[in-house]
Amino acid sequence: MAQAEIETLRAQAAAGEIVLAYVDEAGFSQVHPNRSAWTPTGERHLIEAKRGKRLNVLAAMISNGELFSANFWETTTAAAFSGFLSLLQEHVAGPITVILDNASIHKAKAEREFIEYLKKQGVTLYFLPPYSPELNRIERLWHKMKHTWMAPKCRDAKVLEIDIGEILSNFGSKYTFSF
């Protein structure tokens, strides 16, 4: 049912009736995640986990092909998310439907009043069914960034910011994918 509703929203966006945005947040660690390892038979498998600082990105993949994003080193909070929605609404200047998951920061009680205000400004939130990341197209961006476009290496904070910025600012030209 959600897939059919999203197809209807996509048709409305294609007709220029609404702006559609797939919104999500992702965190990027200074140390690339270790996805596999080899351990001899009979030995205990141990890998020391190092993370370093984490750069968080809130982003919207907009139906016009644009990527709108904000990066920050702090924890992603409900207030940060509400602020991002406000900036997104100002950026698109028109009715916008936001497709997003059910993360607690998206539904925080402390931000309900502000979310109601945004609704009056033309922002509609469309919450996906639980456990259906395949319906949020921006999830594909995070996967590509983490596992294809970013080389598996350790980075200091500045290099991590530069690498993330390079991808986000060149999305749609140098960095692309199709559905």
Range-by-range predicted roles:
Residues M1-F179:
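Short functional hotspots at interaction and active-site rims
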